[in-house]
Amino acid sequence: MFVVKTAVLLFFALFIGNTYAYTYSLDRIQALKFSSESSNVDDGPRLHCKGPACSSHSNDLAICQHNQLNVAPHLLKWTCVWPNQSSHVEVIDYNIECKKTVALSMDSITKTCILNYKLEWTYSGVLLHRPWKLFSLKPFTAAFVLLLAASYLATACFRMLGYLGTPRSRFHDNRRWNEQKFMELAVSAVEEQLSNGIQLFSNVKQRVPVPVLDESV
């Protein structure tokens, strides 16, 4: 009698366990096919798209397959592909959320799982749909500021070296040139007066009689 009861308990335990695992796991379903929101029959949409390209391009078909069969059925990792994806968009990130993991048929799975994905423009898509985003004011502004700084530094260096004091040039500085000419005239006048003074002193020295001492006396 004990053996019969034990066998019955084991039978019910295995049957209920298998039924529970079959009903609330996704390892029996290898792939999920997501269609557009227009063909949806349940309360919420199956496809949730985020990103700037969703308004112009929406993917009507997505096939997702989990890549670890019969391993951790409640924590499946899904790999999704979009066969009808345009070359102007690319999927950046995606994830699958299943509210009810009833694995009795493919239809029940597709009605209860939701695919969230983010759609971004590729280079060709931006060039076709958003060409103004390829041009930014930041590089031009930075280049303009660097050009102004380089021009200021070059002008300061040229002024320190005295290259901008030459007359009849487009960088002619009248004030600096006048000061330079005044200093040159002053220096030449001083040199002329100094030479005249030396010459006058020499002439006076020649005219003054010098007493001669006679040592024989």
Curated annotation (Swiss-Prot):
Q: Biological process GO annotation list?
A: calcium ion transmembrane transport; meiotic cell cycle
Q: Where is the signal peptide?
A: 1-21
Glycosylation is annotated at 84
Q: Which domain of life is it from?
A: Eukaryota
Keyword Signal in the entry? The reply is yes
Classify the protein's membrane topology as the record does.
Single-pass type I membrane protein
Location in the cell reads:
Membrane
Gene Ontology cellular-component annotations: fungal-type vacuole; Golgi apparatus; membrane
Chief location of this protein? membrane
Q: Which residues lie on this side of the membrane: Extracellular?
A: 22-133
Q: Which residues lie on this side of the membrane: Cytoplasmic?
A: 155-217
TM region positions? 134-154
UniProt keyword terms in alphabetical order: Glycoprotein, Meiosis, Membrane, Signal, Transmembrane, Transmembrane helix
Protein's name in the database: Meiotic expression up-regulated protein 29
